[in-house]
C-alpha cells in the first residue's frame, strides 16, 4: 500500500522524530534518507514520493517515487527500496506496480524508466515481472530499464487506472 510522503513527514524522519506513521525495523535505510533529503531540499509540498506500508498494520517498510517530473520526451525515472527484512516477499513488486499505475494517470508520462545496479538480481526480476525492458547492456555500474505505457504493458493501460 502506498501512502504519500509529505514534507512534514520527511523533515521529521530526517530529524529523528516521529513522522506520524509506524516504522518497521530497518526503515528508514540510507537510500531512503538520501531521497528524503532531496525531497526537503528541492521539492514542494506535493513533490514527495510514497511510503510503502504493510496492509496488515500500516508500518512503513520502504519508499518509492520519481526523480522529478516527466521530461519533454514523456520519460520519468522511478526509484524504490525496502528495508532489508521485507525484501523478497513481493512487497516491492506490488509497490512499483502501484506507482506505475499512478503514473499512468499523470499528464505527460509516456515511458517509465529505472536504473538498476549491475548484479542487483532481485530488482532486475521485479522490473521484468512488471513488463520493463532492458534499454542497454551491462556497461558501467547501472543497467537502464523502460516501460512504455499503453503499449502492451502488463496491466498498465494508457489513460486510466482500470
Give the positions of each predicted feature.
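Conserved acetyl-CoA pyrophosphate-binding loop and the N-cap/start of the following alpha-helix
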Residues: 86, 90-99
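Conserved hydrophobic beta-strand within the GNAT/NAT acetyltransferase core sheet
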Residues: 111-116
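Residues that form or flank phosphate/diphosphate-binding pockets in enzymes
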Residues: 73, 90, 122
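Short glycine-rich hinge loops at helix-strand junctions in the catalytic core
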Residues: 90, 107-108, 131
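Conserved active-site alpha-helix within GNAT-family acetyltransferase domains
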Residues: 93, 118-136
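GNAT-family acyltransferases
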Residues: 1-77, 82-85, 101-102, 106, ...
Amino acid at each position: 500500500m502506498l501512502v504519500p510522503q509529505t514534507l512534514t513527514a520527511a523533515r521529521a524522519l530526517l530529524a529523528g522524530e516521529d513522522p506520524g506513521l509506524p516504522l518497521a525495523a530497518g526503515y528508514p535505510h540510507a537510500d531512503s534518507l538520501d531521497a528524503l533529503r532531496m525531497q526537503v531540499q528541492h521539492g514542494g509540498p506535493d513533490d514527495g514520493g510514497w511510503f510503502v506500508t504493510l496492509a496488515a498494520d500500516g508500518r512503513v517498510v520502504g519508499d518509492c517515487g520519481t526523480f522529478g517530473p516527466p521530461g519533454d520526451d514523456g520519460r520519468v525515472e522511478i526509484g524504490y527500496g525496502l528495508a532489508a527484512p521485507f525484501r523478497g516477499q513481493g512487497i516491492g513488486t506490488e509497490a512499483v506496480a502501484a506507482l506505475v499505475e499512478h503514473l499512468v494517470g499523470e499528464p505527460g508520462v509516456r515511458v517509465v524508466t529505472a536504473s538498476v545496479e549491475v548484479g542487483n538480481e532481485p530488482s532486475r526480476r521485479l522490473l521484468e515481472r512488471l513488463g520493463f525492458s532492458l534499454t542497454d547492456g551491462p556497461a558501467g555500474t547501472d543497467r537502464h530499464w523502460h516501460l512504455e505505457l499503453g503499449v502492451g504493458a502488463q496491466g498498465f493501460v494508457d489513460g486510466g487506472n482500470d
